[in-house]
Design a protein with these regions (language model features):
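Short amphipathic helix-loop junctions that connect adjacent transmembrane helices
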Residues: 29-43, 222-238
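Interfacial helix-cap and linker-helix signal at transmembrane-aqueous boundaries
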Residues: 34-35, 66-67, 154-159, 228-229, ...
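Helix-breaking motifs and short loop linkers at transmembrane-helix boundaries and internal kinks
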Residues: 39, 71, 93-95, 233, ...
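Helix-to-loop junctions at the C-terminal end of transmembrane segments
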Residues: 59-72, 156, 253-265, 348
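Structural signature of the two symmetry-related core transmembrane helices
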Residues: 75-89, 98, 268-283
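Helix-loop junctions at membrane interfaces in 12-TM secondary transporters
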Residues: 92-103, 286-295
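Intracellular juxtamembrane helix-capping segments at the cytosolic ends
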Residues: 112-127, 305-319
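Helix-loop-helix hairpin linking two adjacent transmembrane segments in secondary transporters
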Residues: 137-185
Length: 377
């Protein structure tokens, strides 16, 4: 493959991550307004988020089967990103919880496919590239999240509904995704279903690190705006800035992530990042006023920025094959991203949102301890 063609694949993959992040950012911005429009309680909202998680878990096991059937990771990425964009606005049009739950289930199903597909394709592109790329791809996702949340804040400022927020995010994501999806090559044709096999202890530890990290990231995606709204007393527009700050600092961290990992090493990056994220959560819990909580969420984003890329890179080195290790770690991390928000909602129903964030600090400490163990092995 010529360098020009490979650069084109890198740009296309980068843009797919960007489009997916934009959609997720729009979803994060729309959640408080959706909760308010349908008069949902914390427990009911946790059911909606659980439906998103369940939808993804139903489709993830089939990703490996679809790769060879569709002709490669690139083709699966193409189909799944377009499906994700198509259904993104549907939850905003739901007139009741009974309609919202199946829409959320379908959104989760499509997002589960695109998350597995684009990470598998990113791994294939990285294997053909001279140097690490994973942090830059995840930086694109963070940039998209910042873009989607920012657009959501603007639309809400104009007095629009949750449906308008999601539709705007979907249209922007479509403009980004369509040319990128058409530019993707076939990619790796081998199935990734072997990612569900029992991993060795090193890959298992990296999977747990990714699970904990993405559980925190999922909580920031789905609950940061709600926390600022209910606990901090922020206006709807200011409430969206929590996720925007989180995404912005995560983007900044990932832009420098490959160089930081080359200098300090993956385990050190994971350890320091987990501690910084824990500090940010503590700030948000102890100082819940809107601007101090937003500062805390920004620290969480900076801390988590390179944990997952570092875990993916390490898993690719210690597993039997790079694709196997990355797929195992990505699957564990994705489960954390999906299951974290409904878990936080369930805990919030018992002890409140501040208690839920306090629980997340323990997860941050656990990730740091796992990274410390990785440094010794």
């Amino acid at each position: 493959m010529t360098s020009a063609v490979l650069r084109r694949q890198r740009r296309a993959t980068f843009t797919v991550f960007l489009a997916n992040g934009c959609g997720i950012g729009g979803w994060a911005a729309a959640i408080p307004e959706l909760k308010r429009d349908l008069a949902l309680g914390d427990g009911q909202l946790s059911l909606v988020l659980l439906a998103v998680a369940l939808g993804a878990m139903l489709t993830m096991p089939f990703a490996g089967v679809l790769v060879p059937r569709l002709g490669g990771t690139g083709r699966l990425t193409r189909c799944s990103i377009l499906a994700f964009v198509l259904v993104l606005s549907w939850p905003g049009a739901a007139p009741s919880l009974a309609w919202l739950l199946p829409c959320a289930l379908l959104l989760g199903a499509c997002n589960g496919l695109i998350d597995v597909a684009m990470n598998a394709h990113a791994s294939d592109v990285e294997s053909r590239w001279d140097g690490p790329l994973m942090s830059s791809f995840h930086a694109a996702f963070s940039l998209g999240g910042f873009l989607g949340a920012g657009l959501g804040a603007l639309v809400l400022h104009l007095g629009a509904s949750a449906f308008a927020v999601l539709l705007t995010a979907a249209l922007v994501a479509l403009v980004l995704a369509l040319p990128a999806a058409l530019a993707l090559d076939e990619g790796d044709r081998s199935p990734v279903s072997h990612a569900l096999r029992l991993p060795d202890r090193r890959v298992l530890a990296l999977g747990l690190i990714a699970l904990g990290c993405l559980m925190l990231e999922g909580a920031m995606t789905d609950w940061s705006a709600v926390y600022l709204d209910q606990v901090g007393g922020a206006t709807p527009v200011v409430a969206t800035l929590g996720y925007a700050a989180f995404s912005l600092t995560m983007l900044i961290g990932r832009l420098f992530g490959d160089g930081v990992r080359r200098r300090f090493g993956g385990p050190q990056v994971i350890f320091g990042g987990a501690l910084l994220a824990t500090l940010g959560l503590a700030v948000a819990v102890l100082l819940p006023a809107p601007w101090t909580a937003i500062l805390g969420f920004a620290l969480v984003g900076l801390g988590l920025s390179n944990v997952v890329p570092a875990a993916f890179s390490a898993a690719g080195q210690v597993a039997e094959t790079p694709a196997t290790g990355i797929a195992m770690t990505a699957t564990a991390g994705y489960l954390g991203f999906l299951l974290g928000p409904p878990l936080i909602g369930a805990v919030a129903g018992q002890v409140g949102l501040r208690g839920s964030l306090l629980l997340l600090t323990l997860i941050g400490v656990a990730v740091a301890l796992l990274a410390l163990r990785q440094r010794k092995t």
